[in-house]
Amino acid sequence: MNKIYLENDESTNKLGVLISERLKEINKSTIEIHLEGDLGAGKTFLARSIISNSGWSGLVKSPTYTLCEEYDLGDVIFLHIDLYRTDEPEDIHIFDLDRKTHLKKLIIIEWAQKLAIKRNFHLKISFEHFEDGRKVLINDNDELFSSLIKHYE
């Protein structure tokens, strides 16, 4: 696990740009990213940055009330999920995350710490308020994002 410091929205957006660039290079049919942290820690801001910098030109809405927003970019589909308002462990099953698709599937789960049944992830980012910015722990489960981590060393 690696720790970095994000001082402001600009540095958080830069992390989103780096992740979106790496996502384009990874040759996997499904990539899952888990985002954890308190309210206002930067989870949704980072998810918006990743999706926008991957080619989505429209509004990236927070899925806090809808639970899931889908973004079809033609060859890639993003499933942006927010578990903040979920109470039941089975709530995650309604999204059918493991469904087969001809598109590359990129799953971003906010409040992943609320998952009752742990799912495999490729990247987990945990936000923590620190001074005027954020301390961020990055867990690259299978080293697909090692270049991202090296950028901050």
Which ranges hold each PLM region?
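Conserved lysine of the Walker
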Residues: 43
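Short hydrophobic/aromatic beta-strand immediately N-terminal to the Walker A/P-loop
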Residues: 32-34
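P-loop (Walker A) phosphate-binding loop of NTP-binding proteins
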Residues: 36-38
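Phosphate-binding P-loop
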Residues: 22-30
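Short beta-strand-centered segment that lines the nucleotide-binding/catalytic pocket of NTP-utilizing
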Residues: 56-72
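Short phosphate-coordinating micro-motif centered on Lys-Gly-acidic
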Residues: 90, 95-153
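N-terminal pre-Walker A segment at the start of P-loop NTPase domains
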Residues: 1-22
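Switch II (G3) loop of P-loop NTPases
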Residues: 80-87
